């Protein structure tokens, strides 16, 4: 007869523990589900963010005196890109990037923008030098922001 109350206490304890465990599991699942959803949104934005070099890669004019060149990059994706958020590497060197005649322009699908790329260090190339040009762009929209980078071998015309 004395076992009834202790069994009832054990049953209640088991139910409370089971309730706490299920709450933790549901909370964890919700967090994981939200993370997967955010990752999916990011992948969609990345897939819609694209850019292409439309300058002739076999004849990019390079100025050894001013350490600069002019390139044309086209938005070949389906969403608008940020003109001010572009990164360019030339032969592994970070370049400063300035859009030319792009004031008030929305860098939407199909639009090509002229950029001047300039090195802060002395880069001297000979005519016909082949180097890697890497361009990174990001979407104009945020939360999440789509990103894309392209790398091409270009020949410098000095």
Please place each PLM-identified region on the residue numbering.
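Membrane-helix interfacial "entry" motifs
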Residues: 3-7
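N-terminal export/assembly leader peptides and their processing motifs that target proteins to secretory
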Residues: 28-158
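C-terminal juxtamembrane segment of a hydrophobic transmembrane alpha-helix
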Residues: 8-38
């Amino acid at each position: 007869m004395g076992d009834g109350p202790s069994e009832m206490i054990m049953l209640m304890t088991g139910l409370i523990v089971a309730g706490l465990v299920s709450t933790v599991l549901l909370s964890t699942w919700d967090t994981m589900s939200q993370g997967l959803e955010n990752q999916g949104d990011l992948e969609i934005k990345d897939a819609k963010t694209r850019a292409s070099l439309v300058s002739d890669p076999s004849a990019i004019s390079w100025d050894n005196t001013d350490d600069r060149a002019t390139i044309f990059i086209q938005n070949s994706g389906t969403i608008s890109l940020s003109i001010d958020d572009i990164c360019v590497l030339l032969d592994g060197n970070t370049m400063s990037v300035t859009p030319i005649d792009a004031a008030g322009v929305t860098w939407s699908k199909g639009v090509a923008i002229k950029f001047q790329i300039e090195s802060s260090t002395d880069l001297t190339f000979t005519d016909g030098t082949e180097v890697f040009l890497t361009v990174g762009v990001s979407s104009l929209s945020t939360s999440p922001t789509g990103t894309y980078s392209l790398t091409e071998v270009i020949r410098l015309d000095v």
